[in-house]
Amino acid sequence: MQKTSILILALFAIAEAVPTTGPIRVRRQVLGGSLASNPAGGADARLNLSKGIGNPNHNVVGQVFAAGNTQSGPVTTGGTLAYNNAGHGASLTKTHTPGVKDVFQQEAHANLFNNGRHNLDAKVFASQNKLANGFEFQRNGAGLDYSHINGHGASLTHSNFPGIGQQLGLDGRANLWSSPNRATTLDLTGSASKWTSGPFANQKPNFGAGLGLSHHFG
Protein backbone atom coordinates (compact mmCIF):
# COMPACT_ATOMS: atom_id res chain seq x y z
CA MET A 1 0.00 0.00 0.00
CA GLN A 2 2.85 2.38 0.88
CA LYS A 3 4.65 1.66 -2.41
CA THR A 4 1.46 2.28 -4.37
CA SER A 5 0.89 5.59 -2.57
CA ILE A 6 4.43 6.69 -3.43
CA LEU A 7 3.85 5.82 -7.11
CA ILE A 8 0.58 7.74 -7.13
CA LEU A 9 2.31 10.82 -5.71
CA ALA A 10 5.14 10.45 -8.22
CA LEU A 11 2.82 10.30 -11.21
CA PHE A 12 0.81 13.24 -9.89
CA ALA A 13 4.06 15.22 -9.60
CA ILE A 14 4.83 14.40 -13.25
CA ALA A 15 1.41 15.69 -14.23
CA GLU A 16 1.97 18.94 -12.32
CA ALA A 17 5.34 19.43 -14.02
CA VAL A 18 3.86 19.41 -17.53
CA PRO A 19 3.25 22.98 -18.76
CA THR A 20 -0.29 23.91 -19.75
CA THR A 21 -1.53 26.09 -22.57
CA GLY A 22 -4.80 27.77 -23.36
CA PRO A 23 -7.27 29.67 -21.20
CA ILE A 24 -9.23 28.08 -18.37
CA ARG A 25 -12.96 27.97 -19.00
CA VAL A 26 -15.95 26.52 -17.20
CA ARG A 27 -17.74 23.75 -19.06
CA ARG A 28 -21.48 23.18 -18.92
CA GLN A 29 -22.99 20.17 -17.24
CA VAL A 30 -23.15 17.13 -19.52
CA LEU A 31 -25.67 14.33 -19.17
CA GLY A 32 -24.54 11.12 -20.83
CA GLY A 33 -24.48 7.39 -20.59
CA SER A 34 -24.29 4.08 -22.39
CA LEU A 35 -26.24 0.91 -23.07
CA ALA A 36 -24.40 -2.32 -23.87
CA SER A 37 -25.62 -5.85 -24.51
CA ASN A 38 -24.54 -8.46 -21.96
CA PRO A 39 -23.96 -12.10 -23.07
CA ALA A 40 -25.11 -13.25 -19.63
CA GLY A 41 -28.49 -11.57 -20.09
CA GLY A 42 -30.10 -8.15 -20.23
CA ALA A 43 -28.15 -5.01 -21.01
CA ASP A 44 -25.64 -3.03 -18.96
CA ALA A 45 -26.85 0.55 -18.62
CA ARG A 46 -25.04 3.58 -17.25
CA LEU A 47 -26.21 7.16 -16.72
CA ASN A 48 -23.81 9.90 -15.66
CA LEU A 49 -23.82 13.64 -15.04
CA SER A 50 -20.47 15.40 -15.45
CA LYS A 51 -19.16 18.91 -14.99
CA GLY A 52 -15.64 20.09 -15.67
CA ILE A 53 -13.46 23.16 -15.34
CA GLY A 54 -10.57 23.80 -17.72
CA ASN A 55 -9.69 23.05 -21.31
CA PRO A 56 -9.21 19.74 -23.18
CA ASN A 57 -5.56 19.47 -22.08
CA HIS A 58 -5.81 20.66 -18.48
CA ASN A 59 -8.98 20.12 -16.49
CA VAL A 60 -10.78 18.92 -13.40
CA VAL A 61 -13.95 16.88 -13.91
CA GLY A 62 -16.53 15.75 -11.38
CA GLN A 63 -19.06 13.05 -12.19
CA VAL A 64 -21.91 11.21 -10.48
CA PHE A 65 -23.28 8.04 -12.02
CA ALA A 66 -25.59 5.05 -11.72
CA ALA A 67 -25.01 1.72 -13.44
CA GLY A 68 -26.69 -1.66 -13.52
CA ASN A 69 -28.12 -4.50 -15.57
CA THR A 70 -31.63 -4.19 -16.97
CA GLN A 71 -32.44 -7.81 -16.16
CA SER A 72 -30.93 -8.48 -12.74
CA GLY A 73 -28.74 -7.22 -9.94
CA PRO A 74 -28.68 -4.02 -7.86
CA VAL A 75 -27.85 -0.57 -9.21
CA THR A 76 -24.37 0.74 -8.42
CA THR A 77 -24.16 4.46 -7.66
CA GLY A 78 -21.07 6.57 -7.17
CA GLY A 79 -18.99 9.61 -7.93
CA THR A 80 -15.59 10.45 -9.40
CA LEU A 81 -13.31 13.47 -9.16
CA ALA A 82 -10.60 13.45 -11.82
CA TYR A 83 -7.66 15.72 -12.66
CA ASN A 84 -5.99 15.69 -16.09
CA ASN A 85 -2.93 17.53 -17.37
CA ALA A 86 -1.81 16.74 -20.93
CA GLY A 87 -2.67 13.06 -20.60
CA HIS A 88 -1.35 12.65 -17.05
CA GLY A 89 -3.63 12.74 -14.04
CA ALA A 90 -5.27 11.21 -11.01
CA SER A 91 -8.76 10.33 -9.84
CA LEU A 92 -10.78 9.41 -6.76
CA THR A 93 -13.85 7.18 -7.13
CA LYS A 94 -16.41 6.06 -4.55
CA THR A 95 -19.08 3.44 -5.39
CA HIS A 96 -21.91 1.77 -3.48
CA THR A 97 -23.67 -1.43 -4.56
CA PRO A 98 -26.56 -2.22 -2.17
CA GLY A 99 -26.25 -5.62 -0.58
CA VAL A 100 -22.90 -6.25 -2.28
CA LYS A 101 -20.03 -3.87 -1.47
CA ASP A 102 -18.63 -0.36 -1.07
CA VAL A 103 -15.40 0.65 -2.81
CA PHE A 104 -13.14 3.70 -2.55
CA GLN A 105 -10.45 3.77 -5.25
CA GLN A 106 -7.52 6.08 -5.90
CA GLU A 107 -5.77 6.03 -9.28
CA ALA A 108 -3.02 7.91 -11.09
CA HIS A 109 -1.96 7.58 -14.70
CA ALA A 110 0.77 8.88 -16.98
CA ASN A 111 0.78 8.92 -20.77
CA LEU A 112 3.81 7.13 -22.19
CA PHE A 113 3.10 7.47 -25.91
CA ASN A 114 0.52 9.11 -28.17
CA ASN A 115 0.93 9.76 -31.89
CA GLY A 116 -2.72 10.45 -32.65
CA ARG A 117 -3.47 6.83 -33.58
CA HIS A 118 -1.84 4.76 -30.84
CA ASN A 119 -2.00 5.62 -27.14
CA LEU A 120 -0.24 3.93 -24.22
CA ASP A 121 -0.80 4.83 -20.55
CA ALA A 122 0.71 3.53 -17.32
CA LYS A 123 -1.40 3.50 -14.17
CA VAL A 124 -1.18 2.72 -10.46
CA PHE A 125 -4.16 2.24 -8.18
CA ALA A 126 -5.27 1.38 -4.67
CA SER A 127 -8.73 0.58 -3.33
CA GLN A 128 -10.41 -0.16 -0.03
CA ASN A 129 -13.30 -2.62 -0.30
CA LYS A 130 -16.01 -3.56 2.19
CA LEU A 131 -18.47 -6.36 1.43
CA ALA A 132 -22.06 -6.34 2.67
CA ASN A 133 -21.21 -9.05 5.22
CA GLY A 134 -18.62 -6.76 6.82
CA PHE A 135 -15.51 -8.39 5.32
CA GLU A 136 -12.91 -5.80 4.30
CA PHE A 137 -9.92 -6.12 1.99
CA GLN A 138 -7.53 -3.93 0.03
CA ARG A 139 -6.43 -4.08 -3.58
CA ASN A 140 -3.53 -2.21 -5.12
CA GLY A 141 -1.44 -2.58 -8.23
CA ALA A 142 -0.31 -1.20 -11.56
CA GLY A 143 -1.00 -1.69 -15.23
CA LEU A 144 -0.66 -0.62 -18.85
CA ASP A 145 -3.56 0.52 -21.05
CA TYR A 146 -3.33 0.61 -24.86
CA SER A 147 -5.92 2.11 -27.19
CA HIS A 148 -6.18 2.64 -30.96
CA ILE A 149 -8.05 5.45 -32.68
CA ASN A 150 -10.30 2.88 -34.40
CA GLY A 151 -11.62 1.59 -31.07
CA HIS A 152 -9.31 -1.36 -30.41
CA GLY A 153 -7.62 -1.68 -27.04
CA ALA A 154 -5.92 -3.87 -24.46
CA SER A 155 -4.90 -3.65 -20.82
CA LEU A 156 -2.50 -5.61 -18.63
CA THR A 157 -2.99 -5.32 -14.86
CA HIS A 158 -1.14 -6.73 -11.86
CA SER A 159 -3.16 -6.65 -8.63
CA ASN A 160 -2.07 -7.31 -5.07
CA PHE A 161 -4.58 -8.29 -2.38
CA PRO A 162 -2.68 -8.02 0.95
CA GLY A 163 -3.15 -11.18 2.98
CA ILE A 164 -4.84 -12.95 0.06
CA GLY A 165 -2.56 -13.10 -2.97
CA GLN A 166 -1.61 -11.55 -6.29
CA GLN A 167 -3.42 -11.70 -9.62
CA LEU A 168 -2.50 -10.96 -13.23
CA GLY A 169 -5.20 -9.86 -15.68
CA LEU A 170 -5.33 -9.24 -19.42
CA ASP A 171 -8.27 -7.65 -21.28
CA GLY A 172 -8.67 -6.95 -24.98
CA ARG A 173 -11.19 -5.29 -27.27
CA ALA A 174 -11.50 -5.34 -31.07
CA ASN A 175 -13.93 -2.97 -32.74
CA LEU A 176 -15.83 -4.72 -35.54
CA TRP A 177 -18.14 -1.87 -36.54
CA SER A 178 -18.78 1.75 -35.62
CA SER A 179 -21.43 4.25 -36.65
CA PRO A 180 -20.14 7.36 -38.48
CA ASN A 181 -20.13 9.36 -35.23
CA ARG A 182 -18.77 6.38 -33.23
CA ALA A 183 -21.67 6.62 -30.79
CA THR A 184 -22.70 3.04 -31.56
CA THR A 185 -20.14 0.24 -31.74
CA LEU A 186 -19.98 -3.53 -32.12
CA ASP A 187 -17.02 -4.94 -30.20
CA LEU A 188 -15.45 -8.33 -29.62
CA THR A 189 -14.00 -8.57 -26.11
CA GLY A 190 -11.82 -11.09 -24.32
CA SER A 191 -10.28 -11.45 -20.87
CA ALA A 192 -7.96 -13.74 -18.94
CA SER A 193 -6.88 -13.72 -15.30
CA LYS A 194 -4.65 -15.91 -13.14
CA TRP A 195 -3.79 -15.91 -9.45
CA THR A 196 0.02 -15.93 -9.22
CA SER A 197 0.29 -16.34 -5.43
CA GLY A 198 -1.85 -17.15 -2.42
CA PRO A 199 -4.34 -19.96 -1.78
CA PHE A 200 -5.86 -19.67 -5.28
CA ALA A 201 -2.55 -19.91 -7.17
CA ASN A 202 -3.15 -23.57 -8.09
CA GLN A 203 -6.40 -22.77 -9.86
CA LYS A 204 -6.59 -22.71 -13.65
CA PRO A 205 -6.67 -19.37 -15.47
CA ASN A 206 -10.09 -17.81 -15.92
CA PHE A 207 -11.01 -16.91 -19.51
CA GLY A 208 -13.90 -14.90 -20.89
CA ALA A 209 -15.12 -13.61 -24.25
CA GLY A 210 -18.08 -11.69 -25.57
CA LEU A 211 -19.63 -9.89 -28.51
CA GLY A 212 -21.47 -6.73 -27.59
CA LEU A 213 -23.31 -3.79 -29.12
CA SER A 214 -22.92 -0.49 -27.26
CA HIS A 215 -24.45 2.95 -27.67
CA HIS A 216 -23.13 6.09 -25.98
CA PHE A 217 -25.02 9.35 -25.70
CA GLY A 218 -24.32 12.77 -24.28
Swiss-Prot record:
The keyword Nucleotide-binding does not apply. It is found in: Secreted. It holds the Pfam family Attacin_N. Residues 1-17 form the signal peptide. Changing Q138P: In strain: 2CPA-122. One of its GO terms (cellular component) is extracellular region. It comes from the Eukaryota. Induction: By bacterial infection (at protein level). One of its GO terms (biological process) is innate immune response. Residues 18-28 form a propeptide. Keywords: Antibiotic, Antimicrobial, Cleavage on pair of basic residues, Immunity, Innate immunity, Secreted, Signal. Hemolymph (at protein level). Belongs to the attacin/sarcotoxin-2 family. Hemolymph antibacterial protein. This is Attacin-B. It comes from Drosophila melanogaster (Fruit fly). The gene is AttB.
